[in-house]
């Protein structure tokens, strides 16, 4: 009887001790599958970071996978981002045609319904009309026009946003190489003191001159190829200036590039300009150094477009030089 009680007691103690050891091991083992509170916090915020904007700090994905934007399609594509939605006129950008094959027109202003359908994890906008509504769909960054003032700032800004800083630097290196090649190709062809002007005619007959950071090929001509502005247009703060016909000779250049904003293709404003005595008497008109550029091609100012414009401008000048020698 005593032996049976002793055996029972020993067996019971072994079971109790085993249970206690298992319980202790479950709460203290460093290899336990259950995360600690700190680990849970890390897991919840994994893949997100803070990005400072004028509207405050926004939590965005470290590597966004699906981005919707209004006017920053080219900027984001230049650093390899996956753009799934853009505003409609971006599709007219000839430099982005192949890159936008999988993207959707999300309207302008951006349609919240169309944006929601794209399931973005990041939204980047130039205009902030629907900012609050868009912010409820995905983290939204408002980057106002003019935040970056040249191609280098632009590419690095959007490389940061897209989590692609290395690709941004690769793009810049390729851009610098192309710009250097373009300058080399123009040596001995273009007088180093020659001036180059960018002009635009509207369908209302208004004539404008542009600086180095307002599209129309400005960054390609002035920043990449290092060509000179007309002497009266050397003020950096004057990115656009409306000209009267009386002012035009003062702002004329040795080489002049004209784009025409004429959405209905009437052609009336251009005919009137070309028939004017002032236009006919310009040095560029007489010397055949006046170029008429496609609006959709040269209006663009994203990094991909600027890079493409370098080749177009160099080819234009080289061909023009050959023609003038005949």
Where are these regions (language model features)?
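Alpha-helical, coiled-coil/dimerization segments enriched in small aliphatic residues
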Residues: 90-94, 208-240
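Extracytoplasmic ligand-binding site segments that recognize negatively charged/polar headgroups
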Residues: 144-157, 193-219, 263-269
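Charged, glycine-enriched surface loops/patches
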Residues: 69, 132-169, 176, 191, ...
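Proline-aspartate-enriched helix->loop->beta-strand connector
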Residues: 115-125, 139, 248, 252-256
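Structured C-terminal subdomain patch of bacterial secreted/periplasmic proteins
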Residues: 255-326
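Short helix-initiation/N-cap motifs at beta->coil->alpha
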Residues: 53, 104-112, 235-244
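A short, structured surface patch at a secondary-structure boundary
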Residues: 68-118
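Bacterial Sec-exported substrate-binding components of ABC uptake systems
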Residues: 2-11, 22-69, 167-198, 266-269, ...
């Amino acid at each position: 009887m005593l032996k049976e009680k002793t055996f029972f007691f020993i067996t019971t103690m072994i079971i109790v001790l085993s249970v206690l050891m298992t319980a202790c091991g479950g709460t203290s083992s460093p290899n336990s599958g259950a995360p600690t509170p700190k680990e849970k916090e890390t897991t919840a915020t994994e893949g997100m970071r803070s990005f400072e904007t004028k509207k405050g700090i926004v939590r965005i994905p470290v590597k966004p996978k699906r981005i919707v934007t209004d006017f920053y399609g080219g900027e984001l594509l230049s650093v390899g981002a996956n753009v799934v939605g853009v505003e409609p006129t971006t599709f007219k950008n000839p430099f982005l045609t192949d890159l936008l094959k999988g993207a959707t027109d999300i309207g302008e202003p951006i349609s919240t319904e169309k944006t929601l359908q794209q399931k973005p994890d990041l939204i980047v906008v130039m205009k902030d009309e629907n900012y609050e509504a868009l912010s409820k769909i995905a983290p939204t960054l408002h980057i106002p026009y003019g935040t970056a003032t040249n191609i280098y700032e632009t590419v690095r800004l959007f490389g940061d946003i897209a989590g692609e800083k290395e690709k941004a630097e690769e793009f810049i290196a390729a851009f610098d190489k192309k710009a250097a090649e373009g300058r080399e190709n123009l040596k001995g062809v273009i007088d180093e003191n020659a001036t180059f002007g960018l002009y635009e005619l509207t369908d209302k007959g208004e004539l404008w001159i542009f600086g180095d950071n307002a599209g129309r090929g400005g960054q390609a001509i002035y920043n990449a190829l290092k060509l000179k502005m007309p002497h009266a247009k050397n003020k950096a703060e004057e990115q656009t200036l409306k000209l009267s016909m009386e002012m035009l000779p003062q702002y004329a250049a040795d080489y002049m590039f004209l784009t025409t904003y004429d959405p209905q293709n009437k052609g009336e404003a251009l005919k009137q300009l070309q028939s004017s005595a002032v236009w006919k008497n310009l040095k560029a008109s007489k010397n055949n150094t006046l170029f008429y550029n496609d609006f959709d091609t040269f209006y663009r100012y994203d990094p991909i477009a600027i890079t493409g414009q370098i080749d177009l401008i160099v080819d234009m000048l080289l061909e023009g030089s050959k023609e003038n020698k005949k």
